Amino acid sequence: MRTFLLCLGVWLSPSVWAAHAYAQFGDIKYPEGFSHFSYVNPTAPKGGEIAMVSPSRASSFDKYNPFTLKGTAPPGLGSLMLETLLTGNSDEPTTAYGLLAEDVNVAKDKLSVTFRLNPLARFHNGDPVLAMDVKYSYDRLTSKEAAPQFRTYFSEVAGVVVVSEREIRFNFKRANAELPLIVGSMSVFSHKWGADKPLDKIITDVPIGSGPYKLGQVDFGKDIQYVRDKNYWAKNLNVRKGMFNFDRISYRLYKDTTAQFEGFKAGEFDYIQAFVAREWARGYKGKLFDNGTLIKKELQHGNAGDFQGFMFNTRLPKFKDARVRQAIGLAMDYEWMNRQLFYQAYTRVRGYFVGSDFEAKDLPDTDELNLLEPMRDMLDPAIFTQPVPLPPVTSLDPASGHTLRDHLRQARDLLAQAGWTYRDGALRNAKGEAFTLEFLDNSGSMGRVVTPYAKNLEKLGFKVVYKVVDFAVLQKRMDVFDFELISNRTGGSEAPGTELLERFGSKSADTEGSSNIIGVKDPAVDALLDKVVAAQTRGQLVAACKALDRVLRHGHYSVPHWYGSVHRVSWRAGRFDQPNITPRYYQPESWIQSTWWATPANFAGVR
């Protein structure tokens, strides 16, 4: 997620900003010298513990290094043990403030940014955080030994200069108002961590970070605990006051979601988030919920919606034709699923910027056309003449023209246009090859969705396979693009930016481990991504994202799923207190970890 940060403080000259915070555009809530964020309790007691489960689908971990492609790092390590030059907050999704850096200066031409480090900043080994550590971190993260997304993310950085012991400057290849935000969000670790090894050979060496927690007890691969650093350098800093109150934060990892939920009811951990509507409606009930042992709550939030869908691997020849992809999408009867499977709990995903100002609607507006016209020859003419594609809405009215039968008839016509017809018991191309579809999953939770979907696809002649594999196998197959159709979710953003280069850019399409899972390779998309990154005003950003969303949706690169408007969470009663104010923009796990605190019963070890 791209973060906007607001430049605050004193104008030192017409060409340089210097402040405790920086922004691409917008206003800020907290002035220089503010005491604490509004959604925390600055006098919250320290102590107690909270036990959680991995927010990802990982069932184990095999390394402590979160920056390499191979293997799985434990949950929580990056956010609890490592820190960045700047930190965001949950009031303002586009604003951040100094953390490791106490001062930030952006040149008027936006070709460089200089950070001055806080002299109080210390790593867990007691060493001061110095400019050479920041440069060491950057050099490591942009090396070929690191996961490829870091090289994409920092691709516009021309170089890093150690100005003095506590001053570091990032030079940029071109003026880009977002770049100070990007480098400000880079994890910083000590130059002593793995100094004698290539980054991809640092596996079980514990990162030397500066965060509020250190590594505690570990059952390697299964459970991990983090312990609060009593000498944490930033505990009295305004961006940390009233935060990270638990003495111990632990994670337990389970083989599957069934074992995980049974562990929760048995008291093995304290907090869980539900992602499946059926489980929330049918599983989160019974004696423990009725007698108040477990609390079940739907939390409101203002986050942009996440995109989720079945994503095609367009590197495969059979998915190259957009008509084929569109036809497969027409076979999903979402309305039936929402009635029968989802308890009417979801809204259909329409585009790649769910529920935000960046979502394309109807025909392109004037600002979009100004971006699209110069590339008209590269684009489908329908982009200019037809409303942006929406997922099909299945009607039960035979006269509507939008029944499932109507959609399947339309899909059959599209497949025929693309050279796929039904004969000899299957959908075949001119060579006689049958069209198979493999849906890959790791938890089995998509089975109830794929089963009715597969029945509709089989009516068109597809041979459908639903395959469940271990998370590690799934991750590896995703990394090397060895899949056909896969369910995937990407986080929404209040300010999309450079992360989209990695998600949709041609340069990342064939880079193993990249987040361009679909394999998008489109010069028009690349040109629009450049407009997104180069946006100087929010209006320019909105126009560029809407145009990008429009082009991607006309490409039918995925079968959109659904999203919910609330966080569905449950926790053990009597063990925690929380601030009176709930922020607008937050993820529940990080909000609970960073702002809640232990009750006297928790301190006493009562579960």
Question: Positions of the model-derived regions?
Answer:
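Ligand-site clamp/hinge motif
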Residues: 118, 201, 234-284, 326, ...
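Surface-exposed binding/hinge segments that line
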Residues: 116, 150-195, 210-219, 364-377, ...
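Aromatic-rich, solvent-exposed beta-strand/loop patch
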Residues: 98-108, 124, 129, 153, ...
